[in-house]
């Protein structure tokens, strides 16, 4: 099909690894010259949140958020946008049941790009300071969009954006038990001896 496959060039994007602290996971990657920490989380059962810490940089970066047509703002501030789910077909008289995707941005900055007819994107401008923001994503029926608006208001009122930098500094040990085993010495009957490290088959994690 002549489409390019494989990893992107590192100066475009590069996955660096992850940090685990308790039940939280922080991804580390770069987009262009800007470093990014990202932690996924949920609000309720169906609002997915991308918590982001974006390093300073001289260039704007663009985030792909969803695929869909007919993007429109849902509130006067421009924080919440709505798109039709990609591939959805709706009869004229069943608009309330139309599958849609709604997204919201909370935090330091972020500008919705509604120009593309098939993609919803978020533009994060260049900045001399690190930026913290949260992107909330929801899918459901058009008639249920008000539930998402309430969820956005609740997230904004309940908590600030998590400190992802702090979560990369390490926390309590995940496994505190000590696993002991033995080494069986080999017979020194030749020019060298081979010792055997006995695998700890009996361990709390049943890992062997």
Q: What is each model feature region?
A:
Residues 11-20, 71-74, 110-115:
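Short, exposed beta-strand/loop patches in secreted or surface proteins that constitute
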Residues 45-46, 53-72:
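Surface-exposed beta-strand/loop patches in extracellular or lumenal glycoproteins
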């Amino acid at each position: 099909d002549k489409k390019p496959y494989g990893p992107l060039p590192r100066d475009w994007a590069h996955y660096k690894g992850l940090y685990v602290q308790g039940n939280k996971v922080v991804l580390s990657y770069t987009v262009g010259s800007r470093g990014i920490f990202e932690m996924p989380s949920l609000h309720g059962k169906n609002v997915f949140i991308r918590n982001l810490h974006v390093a300073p940089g001289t260039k704007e970066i663009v985030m792909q958020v969803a695929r869909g047509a007919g993007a429109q703002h849902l509130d006067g501030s421009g924080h919440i946008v709505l798109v039709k789910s990609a591939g959805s077909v709706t009869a004229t008289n069943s608009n309330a049941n139309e599958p849609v995707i709604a997204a919201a941005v909370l935090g330091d900055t972020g500008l919705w790009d509604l120009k593309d007819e098939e993609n919803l994107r978020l533009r994060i401008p260049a900045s001399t300071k690190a930026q913290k923001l949260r992107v909330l994503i929801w899918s459901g029926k058009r008639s249920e969009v008000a539930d998402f608006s309430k969820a956005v208001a609740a997230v904004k009122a309940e908590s600030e954006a998590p400190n992802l930098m702090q979560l990369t500094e390490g926390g309590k040990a995940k496994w505190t038990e000590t696993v002991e085993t033995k080494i069986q010495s080999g017979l020194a009957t030749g020019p060298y001896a081979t010792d055997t490290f006995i695998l700890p088959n009996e361990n709390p994690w049943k890992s062997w």
